[in-house]
């Protein structure tokens, strides 16, 4: 950096900066052309020259994303030198600065977690929630870094953030179960450190996988027991009570390469086709088909709810239900059942949708058959149950079997080199 520009930066004078620019209009551009350099913004951020730093963000916003010869951005330097106000102002201008990877893949958010500033950590997360996904060159997430530096309060903030945020639940689950270069999750680290407070905090997260194996095939429980006489018995009990197991007890789980080399069965073929249909259908088509299914459910239920007039009802009680009427009610029940199942298949992927759907539709189906019993008596009720209800149960059982097949017990890969599309295979 030019010596005159360095002196102006160290002084923090905005007026002196513009005087220098008037004398040499290209002075900032000469700095900007270099890919790695200690820019005036680096110097201002390190020294806490707030006014000058904000002026440089206007003149040359590209400075904020450059790394100096030590692999640090201006925001890294502001965090390292406890320039909290300046760091927050930089993030206000460009929240993505929180995700800049410096030396070792460390982001400013990682540095904040390492230093232990809870307030700044929260501010960074609020400004850029996606930054929680970032990992360093060792594959360590912010959770790994927090545990390795024994920052318990920061861990409570992070786990609380992941559990209370309403969006991107899958992202936070991946962060919680992410493995570092050695295949160790945050639970492995906590078990190795014999840190009972951290283990208790982690197992409160329902999305935490207690049985992930590292590259040595060890679960968190194995890592804990490997400490021998130094093992904390309380931690062992906590992990076991939360569902943690040893790697040996998981030996029956199928390896990925075995699963992939096996021939595709007809059931897997059908499962794949349905899964692709659910994932590829557009929102517009899904909404239109759900409306059609809802209309069919409404029409068939209304047909079942139509009361016979007194003359026909007496005739039915005297002579019984005619075969044609029985077929009408049977076909109506089948249509009702298929519409219920079809609308279930059309739901977006996610267990929350499925559970709410069951909560709503089970009383509806029950009231449908109860209505027929009240209108036509026990004998007709059992006939319809045999033709329609049994068909519905069969379809639901078939779907449950298919659903279980999609969640086959396959050992998780020993690295995180797996895309979201591949995860959807099983």
Swiss-Prot record:
A GO BP entry: response to salicylic acid
Gene3D superfamilies: Ankyrin repeat-containing domain
Main location as per UniProt: membrane
Topology of the protein relative to the lipid bilayer: Multi-pass membrane protein
Effect of residue 74 to L: In bad1-1; suppression of constitutive activation of defense responses in snc2-1D mutant
A GO cellular-component term linked to this record: plasma membrane
Coiled-coil boundaries: none
ANK repeat placement: 1-29, 36-65, 70-99, 104-134, 138-167, 182-212
Result after altering residue 330 to E: In bad1-17D; gain-of-function mutant. Dwarf and lesion mimic phenotype. Constitutive activation of defense responses
Keywords of this entry: ANK repeat, Cell membrane, Membrane, Plant defense, Repeat, Transmembrane, Transmembrane helix
Top-level taxon of origin: Eukaryota
A Pfam family per the record: Ank_2
Transmembrane region(s): 288-308, 329-349, 355-375, 380-400
Compartments it resides in: Cell membrane
Function: Involved in plant defense. Required for basal resistance against Pseudomonas syringae pv. tomato DC3000. Required for resistance against nonpathogenic bacteria. May be involved in signaling components that function downstream of SNC2 and upstream of NPR1 and WRKY70 to regulate defense responses.
Protein name: Ankyrin repeat-containing protein BDA1
Top-level taxonomy: Eukaryota, Viridiplantae, Streptophyta, Embryophyta, Tracheophyta
């Amino acid at each position: 950096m030019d010596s005159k520009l360095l002196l102006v930066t160290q002084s923090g004078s905005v007026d002196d900066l513009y005087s220098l620019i008037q004398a040499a209009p290209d002075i900032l551009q000469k700095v900007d052309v270099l890919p790695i350099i200690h820019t005036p913004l680096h110097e201002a951020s390190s020294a806490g020259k707030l006014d000058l730093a904000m002026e440089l963000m206007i003149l040359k916003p590209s400075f904020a994303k450059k790394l100096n010869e030590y692999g640090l951005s201006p925001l890294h330097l502001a965090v390292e030198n406890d320039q909290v106000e300046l760091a927050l102002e930089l993030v206000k201008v460009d929240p993505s600065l929180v995700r800049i990877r410096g030396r070792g893949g460390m982001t400013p958010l990682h540095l904040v977690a390492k230093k232990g500033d809870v307030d700044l950590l929260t501010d960074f997360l609020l400004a850029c929630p996606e930054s929680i996904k970032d990992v360093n060159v060792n594959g360590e997430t912010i959770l790994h870094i927090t545990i390795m530096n024994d920052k318990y309060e920061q861990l409570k903030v992070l786990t609380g953030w992941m559990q209370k945020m309403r969006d991107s639940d899958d992202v936070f689950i991946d962060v919680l179960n992410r493995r570092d270069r050695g295949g160790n999750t945050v639970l492995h680290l906590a078990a190795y450190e014999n840190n009972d407070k951290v283990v208790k905090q982690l197992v409160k997260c329902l999305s935490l996988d207690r049985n992930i194996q590292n590259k040595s095939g060890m679960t968190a429980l194995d890592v804990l027991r490997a400490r021998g006489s130094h093992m904390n018995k309380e931690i062992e009990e906590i992990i076991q009570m939360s569902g943690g197991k040893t790697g040996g007890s998981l030996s029956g789980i199928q390896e990925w390469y075995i699963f992939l080399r096996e021939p595709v069965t007809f059931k897997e073929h059908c499962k794949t086709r349905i899964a692709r249909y659910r994932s590829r259908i557009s929102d517009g088509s899904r909404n239109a088909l759900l409306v059609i299914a809802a209309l069919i459910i409404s029409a068939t239920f209304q047909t079942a709810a139509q009361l016979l007039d007194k003359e026909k009802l007496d005739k039915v009680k005297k002579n019984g239900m005619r075969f044609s009427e029985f077929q009408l009610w049977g076909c109506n029940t089948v249509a009702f059942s298929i519409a219920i199942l079809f609308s279930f298949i059309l739901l977006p992927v996610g267990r929350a949708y499925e559970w709410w759907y069951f909560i709503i539709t089970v009383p509806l189906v029950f009231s449908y058959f109860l209505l027929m019993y009240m209108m036509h008596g026990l004998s007709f009720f059992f006939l319809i149950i045999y033709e329609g209800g049994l068909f519905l149960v069969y379809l639901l059982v078939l779907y449950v079997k298919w659903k279980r097949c999609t969640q086959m017990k396959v050992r998780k890969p020993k690295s995180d080199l797996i895309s979201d599309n591949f995860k959807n295979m099983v």
